[in-house]
Amino acid sequence: MRVADFSFELPESLIAHYPQAERSGCRLLSLDGPTGDLTHGVFTDLLDKLNPGDLLVFNNTRVIPARLFGRKVSGGKLEVLVERVLDDHRVLAHVRASKAPKPGTELLLGDDESVKATMAARHDALFELHFDDSRDVLSILNDIGHMPLPPYIDRPDEDADRELYQTVYSQRPGAVAAPTAGLHFDEPMLAALREKGIEMAFVTLHVGAGTFQPVRVDTIEDHIMHAEYAEVPQDVVDAVLACKARGNRVIAVGTTSVRSLESAAQASQNAPIEPFFGDTKIFIYPGYHYRIIDALVTNFHLPESTLIMLVSAFAGYQNTMSAYRQAVAEQYRFFSYGDAMFITHNPMAEQEKVG
């Protein structure tokens, strides 16, 4: 399967650099998976598309201010993007510098260079950094870090991004990118969903910087996914099984919720889904058999990305690419701060030919 089959033309003007004034004020493109029919509307229309007893599964990860600027004590400037917090004083990070730091290199981090760290070891593309500070890592990041806006948002981060690039229900610090489908849900919207009898459950997947890495191979099957830590606790498993038993739908809010639930289903030995705690490298592309998800709320994704492949596996390749062409023609806003889609599962998608 060719990566190029998932390309589409996107004018630069359709990339959203700021969110809407109101979280739930974005547009919503609804795609009926079985028929391919498209409906244009606004995000609050989602209320009318869900039935009492349906289950929304959110990702409650919280974005950390993971981007740090500084220099080596010896002089060279560098940029650090924390990928994973290992403990109170150690992180794994990407480091951009004219010359990669060697183990033992001392760093001065923060706009005022007030925080000392040491490069302890290298693990392939990642660097293990040890912070020489009495504060824990999360406190340091909150004090001196910048919000890690995606590379396609071509502007410096602003103070407002600490709130805007964060879901209102985020609880578990650890992500370096927001689960962006969740950005559209505000408190009034959540209250209205509860009022209608919509059930809610929360997984955790700490989104890594790898989510923005381009696919660097020509053939999809040759791509190796990055690892991300996910948790699907017992209460989520119980909610999913109860939802299925009563004939309702499991609706994932975002591709990270999809990957969490489907990882738990893949790893399950004795039931459709069991609790899951660990790293996942699940790669969902056309031909994949969905085990849990019945519908999906998601944003518009980058051309040739693993996420548009995931959507194509869910809705069907032709349906997905046609919907994206229509979204461009209708000038929907794309990517993290952009508009949303509501998609129902196409059971024929896994048999469909791509290209």
Swiss-Prot record:
Q: Which UniProt keywords apply?
A: Cytoplasm, Queuosine biosynthesis, S-adenosyl-L-methionine, Transferase
Q: Which domain of life, per UniProt?
A: Bacteria
Q: In which pathway does it act?
A: tRNA modification; tRNA-queuosine biosynthesis
Q: Which GO terms describe its molecular function?
A: S-adenosylmethionine:tRNA ribosyltransferase-isomerase activity
Q: Name one GO biological process term.
A: queuosine biosynthetic process
Any one Pfam family here would be Queuosine_synth
The EC code for this enzyme is 2.4.99.17
Q: Name one GO cellular component term.
A: cytoplasm
UniProt enzyme class: transferase
Chief localisation class: cytoplasm
Q: What does this protein do?
A: Transfers and isomerizes the ribose moiety from AdoMet to the 7-aminomethyl group of 7-deazaguanine (preQ1-tRNA) to give epoxyqueuosine (oQ-tRNA).
Q: Which NCBIfam families match?
A: PRK00147.1, queA
> What's the family?
Belongs to the QueA family.
Name of the featured protein: S-adenosylmethionine:tRNA ribosyltransferase-isomerase
Q: Which organism is it from?
A: Pectobacterium carotovorum subsp. carotovorum (strain PC1)
Q: Which gene encodes it?
A: queA
